[in-house]
Design a protein with these regions (language model features):
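Bacterial N-terminal signal peptides that target proteins for export
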Residues: 3-20
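Bacterial N-terminal signal peptides
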Residues: 18-29
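Exported/periplasmic ABC-transporter solute-binding proteins
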Residues: 34-72, 76-80, 91-101, 105, ...
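Dinucleotide-binding Rossmann-like beta1-alpha1 core, especially the glycine-rich loop
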Residues: 84
Length: 240
């Protein structure tokens, strides 16, 4: 059974984290005793992930230590040689790591799906974003627009081009540094409207979530996990 948050097109979580984390325990030499599982995760599925991890820890006695950061920083950390048991990010990123020999082939597990959503500062007027035309009007009327360097930011930049409004919006775009929530600049008023993965906006203090992008222009990102090559002699552990 799939569990959903209260917002449609937001995050759909498969209850498979136990299986993924159990696989990482295999990586830790099949230890029978409580193990520490090191996870590097992008922020897109953070809320859903945080809901699953305590249950897993209580059921198994294993400890999960997680670093949450932006997708670009995940790539930089792995490129710099940092080692973890599991990596969680957009599925395409995991696939790229597999091709590069950084993640064990066959270890990818899809964990969650997330759409892109829109938010404004708490208490601010709430523009209509229920249709593509309404969204365009809201964006063109906004004094400033926040978006991220992650998957949603790449998509949003291409969407502005597709809608034919990129040039008009360019002077008022505010892109957050990697690992920084768009909600943080919406909450302070630096950005009048913020656009990011739904799970990164719905639980941010100081932000009123307007809803997901209209279906016609929505993009769903699949967040996946993969076992990092070289983590605790992973090949021997998985095949031994």
């Amino acid at each position: 059974m799939l569990a959903k948050t209260k917002h449609q097109a937001t995050i759909v979580v498969k209850p498979t984290f136990r299986a993924v984390a159990t696989a990482s325990v295999m990586v830790l030499h099949g230890a029978a005793n409580a193990a520490e599982i090191k996870v590097l995760s992008s922020r897109g599925a953070e809320q859903a992930y945080r809901e699953l991890v305590p249950r897993f820890e209580n059921e198994t006695g294993h400890k999960v230590t997680t670093i949450f950061t932006g997708a670009l920083d995940v790539q930089k950390r792995i490129a710099a040689g940092e080692t973890y048991d599991l990596i969680i990010m957009g599925g395409s990123g995991i696939d790229d790591f597999i091709k590069a020999g950084k993640v064990v082939r066959g270890s990818r597990v899809d964990l969650a799906k997330s759409g892109v959503g829109v938010g404004v500062r708490a208490g601010a007027p709430k523009p209509d974003i229920s249709s593509t035309e309404a969204l365009k009007k809201a964006l063109l009327s906004a004094k400033s627009i926040g978006y991220s360097t992650g998957n949603s930011g790449v998509y949003i930049a291409s969407l502005f081009e597709r809608l034919g409004i990129a040039a008009e919006l360019a002077p008022k775009l505010r892109q957050t540094p990697t690992g920084v929530f768009v909600g943080s600049i919406v909450a302070t008023g630096e950005a009048e409207i913020g656009i990011q993965q739904v799970g990164e906006l719905t639980h941010f203090d100081g932000v009123d979530f307007l809803g997901p992008l209209p279906a016609a222009v929505q993009q769903i990102t699949v967040f996946s996990s993969g076992v990092q090559v070289g983590a605790n002699e992973v090949e021997a552990a998985m095949h031994g």
